[in-house]
C-alpha cells in the first residue's frame, strides 16, 4: 500500500543531510544507512548507498528507475540455503 500524498514521502532526515553533502561535493564514497524505509528521491541518483540488511551494509548504486521505491526493496534480509537433502537408501527386493 502506498503512502498518502498528504503526508509526503517517508524520508530520513539524517540520510538526506548526508545525501545533500555528498551530491554537493561530488563525493563517491558509500553512504551508510539503517533507514531501509526511506524513499529514494531524485537527489540520490548516481550515489552509492550502503543499506543495512541486518548483518552488513550492502552497497547499492542508485539509478533513475529506483526513484520512488524504498531502499529496503533492493537488499534481501534472509538467505535461503535450501532444504535438507534426504539420504538415498538402496532398495533391494
UniProtKB/Swiss-Prot annotation:
GO terms for biological process: ribosomal small subunit assembly; translation. GO terms for molecular function: rRNA binding; structural constituent of ribosome. One of its GO terms (cellular component) is cytoplasm. Keywords: Ribonucleoprotein, Ribosomal protein, RNA-binding, rRNA-binding. SUPFAM superfamilies: Ribosomal protein S19. It holds the Pfam family Ribosomal_S19. InterPro entries: Ribosomal_uS19, Ribosomal_uS19_bac-type, Ribosomal_uS19_CS, Ribosomal_uS19_SF. HAMAP family: Ribosomal_uS19. Protein S19 forms a complex with S13 that binds strongly to the 16S ribosomal RNA. Belongs to the universal ribosomal protein uS19 family. This is Small ribosomal subunit protein uS19.
